[in-house]
């Protein structure tokens, strides 16, 4: 679908990468999955970029190769789980294994306004699955959401369209997940023109 607006999903080995793509396609926007080492020129046409979760720690030696120049692109970027931690580390924040990982349902408190929170209720249920946590804010970012356990669960840059979530909006246990992804698609200004019927044609 070369003439359609599309979002790029960078796959860090997450079982959820294809689910992320599926959720975005259900919103009517075509999605392509790429390796995180991809050259930036392959992403220039994307309306937005999503960094998936992954099973590795950002400190592991065998992490998937990542092209850091991707984070210098002008499109909106959304990091999820591993992608959230990777973005925080890249921009000078701290990530650590605090021994207080979160696995399962959690309640998200909204701390600051964000385009991601449009039509999303405060204290909404989200799905967490992480051992490492962001423990210190990266430069230029603010916390827009936290869990009751105190996890820095949602960040956004104060000047650039950079967002990151520790939780998984693509799974149904995150009750407002579809709305959050829809809000990201909206701020990417991606026109919903994709459908399975058109793809088959």
Sequence positions of predicted segments:
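Flexible gly/pro-rich beta->alpha loop and the following alpha-helix that scaffold active-site loops
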Residues: 4-9, 14-80, 84-85, 91, ...
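Pocket-forming structural segment of enzyme catalytic cores
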Residues: 64-80, 85-179
């Amino acid at each position: 679908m070369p003439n359609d607006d599309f979002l790029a999903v960078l796959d860090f080995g997450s079982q959820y990468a294809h689910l992320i793509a599926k959720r975005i396609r259900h919103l009517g926007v075509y999605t392509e999955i790429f390796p995180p080492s991809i050259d930036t020129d392959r992403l220039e046409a994307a309306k937005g970029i999503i960094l998936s979760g992954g099973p590795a720690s950002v400190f592991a030696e065998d992490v998937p190769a990542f092209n850091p120049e991707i984070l210098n692109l002008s499109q909106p970027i959304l990091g999820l789980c591993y992608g959230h931690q990777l973005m925080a580390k890249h921009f000078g924040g701290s990530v650590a294994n605090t021994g207080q990982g979160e696995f399962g349902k959690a309640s998200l408190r909204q701390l600051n306004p964000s385009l991601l929170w449009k039509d999303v209720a405060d204290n909404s249920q989200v799905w967490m699955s992480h051992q490492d946590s962001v423990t210190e804010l990266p430069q230029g970012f603010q916390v827009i959401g936290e869990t009751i356990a105190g996890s820095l669960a949602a960040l956004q840059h104060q000047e650039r369209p950079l967002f990151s979530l520790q939780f998984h909006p693509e799974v149904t246990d995150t009750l407002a997940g579809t709305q959050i992804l829809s809000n990201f698609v909206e701020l990417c200004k991606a026109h919903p023109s994709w459908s399975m019927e058109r793809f088959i044609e």
